[in-house]
Curated annotation (Swiss-Prot):
EC number of the protein: 1.11.1.21
UniProt-recorded name of the protein: Catalase-peroxidase
UniProt KW keywords: Heme, Hydrogen peroxide, Iron, Metal-binding, Oxidoreductase, Peroxidase
Record-stated family: Belongs to the peroxidase family. Peroxidase/catalase subfamily.
EC category name: oxidoreductase
InterPro entries: Catalase_peroxidase, Haem_peroxidase, Haem_peroxidase_sf, Peroxidases_AS
Pfam families: peroxidase
Residue location of crosslink Tryptophyl-tyrosyl-methioninium (Trp-Tyr) (with M-252): W98-Y226
GO function terms (MF aspect): catalase activity; heme binding; metal ion binding
Ranges that cross the membrane: none
Species the sequence originates in: Edwardsiella tarda
The record's free-text note on cofactor binding: Binds 1 heme b (iron(II)-protoporphyrin IX) group per dimer.
Length: 724
């Protein structure tokens, strides 16, 4: 008989089997290893809905009016476990939606409201999101009722929009279409600080120089959505805060007028909570005990709800009527002089020096009690900064104009990462086309594709020219905010036609051939660019002995310069493209990490990234015709030579510069090829080498071609939401 006492004595019955939480992971031992996990997020193993679930089809079954009615009713259905301020949850729901959308940054398109990521770490436990877990829990009965017909991502934004409507704002519209994720995003860089709300100059600070905020970040501190409401690093100074506000909102794709509108509109309703001590709050949701059931910041010491709630630490309302949409914010801010004080929680805030009793907001529980209104340092920035002040004065004089600007800015804020209008769904989608949506007119889908392809084939363009141009047109796609891609052919417009990475001189030469073909057949240049790339691949595959037709879906349109916000598109400029073995300059981040980031934005898997690299090298598609990484003597043949030679132990590899290596014959030291870090990582990284070995095998020459074509087609069609 075995001795079972070891279990009863408290020893772990699974011993050292599956690792659930404890133990060192590979990343702990080798922290500089390439993190390929960012390419394998949100797959079917984490999604409880299964592969067959189609959210857009489920939306067609949604009773939108009933849902909106239920949300309206929720606003005034105060719950004893988390009572509504003044009997109205409007301010709370607005803050939830604002903070969901406000994490978006234009530099890489990550963050934002498009995935329901506020439900997961780290956002669900950010200091700036204190008590938003209560808002989502208040929404749960509605989510439960409508089930699969409404995503959390859509519901969070709609709740904020309906909150405004219930308080009197005429909103600009709303679009469904945001699909939920089911675990935390691991590709988003939120900063390097080691503690929440770490001030400038702390370890891993996001600031350098005078006050230069690290790209792609928009928020000023780890754990904040935008700026510190108490002032820069917690030190009140409205003009310095105004500078932070301007940078942060610009990185959220907002101009000065939209910034003032969003600040004022967000603070027209609701209040700040700081009537108590933050020391009495429990852990954030991610660190809370099991019995808290996903709720954080619980106060088991004092009352902790209603007028005694603590969230930001600032205490008070901005306006006299915090559950009503009006122009009171500007009257309050601009009509009074303000002085600094501290809240009961010890946070810096501004209060009026003198104010009439009837202009004070009432207590959230007892309307017979009136309290001083407050302003944050960010609010005071709207008064002190000359540009913001001028805009605020105009809004004060023209309430209708303010309401319209805010409604449009709110729509932009909450839809910025939803992508093109073709992804919008629902009865309240605005008809007006907005330039920040990167509009593209519909193209022809019925025409003689074979005839167009034949004309391209007779044009004299090389395989490298056709493939490179199509790739450059499509590689701007970002799955984060659904921007970029080949549709629209913006590669022929400013600013893309002058980007260094697009080789403007070569691009102009190729477009001079393709544009007349598009005109002759009355089809889009966008289609012709992609079709030319496909043709080049077919020719290269044929040369490799594989007959294959690259799938092509006509119907792309051509954008115009007037449809293109040049400044907005500047952020899509590639600073590196490992697929074409190009770096604009040397960066602190390694070339292979830049490749990985681009692959993730393009929504490629590690296998797809691998096969595309191998194919692009042998096609001669390197930037400037460079031979770096071209491990073949048969350029223009879609062979697996890159992988065959990369994995061949007949060679040695030696560094010669920061991003350059020589590959020499082991037997005699003769130079055979040169390579970049991007090339050699496919032989160095154990996972990527495993993929490279698959494509180097003698029996996988045709598999390589077919996998390359599949990955290529995915890239060319990444922005074709009309095909889904």
């Amino acid at each position: 008989m075995g001795n079972n006492n070891e279990f009863s004595s408290g020893k772990c019955p699974v011993m050292h089997g599956g690792m659930t939480s404890a133990g060192m992971a590979s990343k702990d031992w080798w922290p500089n290893a390439l993190n390929l996990d960012i390419l394998h997020q949100h797959d079917t193993k984490t999604n409880p809905m299964g592969q067959q679930f189609n959210y857009r089809e489920a939306l067609k079954q949604l009773d939108v009016q009933a849902l909106k009615d239920d949300l309206r009713a929720l606003m005034t259905d105060s719950q004893p476990w988390w009572p509504a301020d003044w009997g109205h949850y409007g301010g709370l729901m607005v803050r939830m939606a604002w903070h969901s959308a406000g994490s978006y940054r234009i530099a890489d398109g990550r963050g934002g409201a498009g995935t329901g990521n506020q439900r997961f770490a780290p956002l669900n436990s950010w200091p700036d999101n204190v008590n938003l877990d209560k808002a989502r829990r208040l929404l749960w009965p509605i989510k439960k009722k409508y089930g699969n017909k409404i995503s959390w991502a859509d519901l969070i934004v709609l709740a904020g929009t309906m909150a405004y409507e219930s308080m009197g704002l005429k909103t600009f519209g709303f679009a469904f279409g945001r699909e939920d994720i089911w675990h935390p995003e691991i590709d988003t860089y939120w900063g390097s600080e080691k503690e929440w709300l770490a001030p400038s100059g702390s370890e891993g600070s996001r600031y350098s120089g005078e006050r230069d905020l690290e790209n792609p970040l928009a928020a000023v501190m780890m754990g904040l959505i935008y700026v510190n409401p108490e002032g820069v690093d917690g030190h009140p100074d409205p003009q310095k805060t105004a500078n932070d506000v301007r940078v942060t909102f610009a990185r959220m794709a907002m101009n000065d007028e939209e910034t003032v509108a969003l600040t004022a509109g967000g603070h027209t309703v609701g209040k700040c909570h700081g009537n108590g001590s933050a020391a009495n709050l429990g852990a954030a949701p991610e660190g809370a005990d099991l019995q808290e059931q996903g709720l954080g910041w619980n106060n088991h010491t004092t009352r902790g709800i209603d007028r005694d709630t603590v969230s930001s630490g600032i205490e008070g309302a901005w306006t006299s009527k915090p559950t009503q949409w009006d122009n009171g914010y500007f009257d309050m801010l601009l009509g009074h002089e303000w002085t600094l004080t501290k809240s009961p929680a010890g946070a810096w805030q501004w209060v009026p020096i003198q104010i009439a009793e009837e202009d004070k907001p009432v207590d959230v529980e007892d309307p017979s009690i009136r309290l001083l209104p407050i302003m944050t340092d960010a609010d005071m920035a709207m008064k002190v900064d000359p540009t913001y002040r001028q805009i605020a004065e105009r809004f004060r004089q023209d309430p209708a104009y303010f309401s319209d600007v805010f409604a449009r800015a709110w729509f932009k804020l909450t839809h910025r990462d939803l992508g093109p209008k073709s992804r919008y769904f629902g009865p309240d989608v605005p008809q007006e086309a907005l330039i920040w949506q990167d509009p593209v007119p519909a193209g022809r889908s019925e025409y003689d594709v074979a005839a167009v392809k034949a004309k391209i084939a007779a044009s004299g363009l090389s395989i490298a020219d056709m493939v490179s141009t199509a790739w450059d047109s499509a590689r701007t796609f970002r799955g984060s905010d659904k921007r970029g891609g080949a549709n629209g052919a913006r590669i022929r417009l400013a600013p893309q036609n002058t980007w260094e990475g697009n080789e403007p001189a070569r691009l102009a030469k190729v477009l001079a051939v393709l544009e007349p073909i598009a005109a002759e057949f009355n089809v889009s240049v966008a289609d012709v660019i992609v079709l030319a790339g496909n043709l080049g691949i077919e020719q290269a595959a044929k040369a490799a002995g594989v007959a294959i037709e690259v799938p092509f879906a006509p119907g792309r349109g051509d954008a115009t310069q007037a449809m293109t916000d040049e400044a907005s598109f500047e952020v899509l400029e590639p600073l590196a493209d490992g697929f074409r073995n190009w770096l604009k300059k040397d960066y602190v981040v390694t070339a292979e990490e830049l490749l990985l980031d681009r692959a993730q934005l393009m929504r490629l898997t590690a296998c797809e990234m691998t096969v595309l690299i191998g194919g692009m090298r042998v096609l001669g598609a390197n930037y400037g015709g460079s031979k770096v990484g071209v491990f073949t003597d048969r350029i223009g043949v879609l062979s697996n030579d890159f992988f065959v030679n990369l994995t061949d132990m007949s060679y040695t590899w030696k560094p010669t510069a920061s991003n350059l290596y020589e590959i020499r014959e082991r037997a005699n030291g003769a130079l055979k090829w040169t390579a970049s870090r991007v090339d050699l990582v496919f032989g160095s990284n154990s996972i990527l080498r495993a993929y490279a070995e698959v494509y180097a095998q003698d029996d996988n020459k045709e598999k390589f071609v077919r996998d390359f074509v599949a990955a290529w087609t995915k890239v060319m069609n990444a922005d074709r939401y009309d095909l889904r």
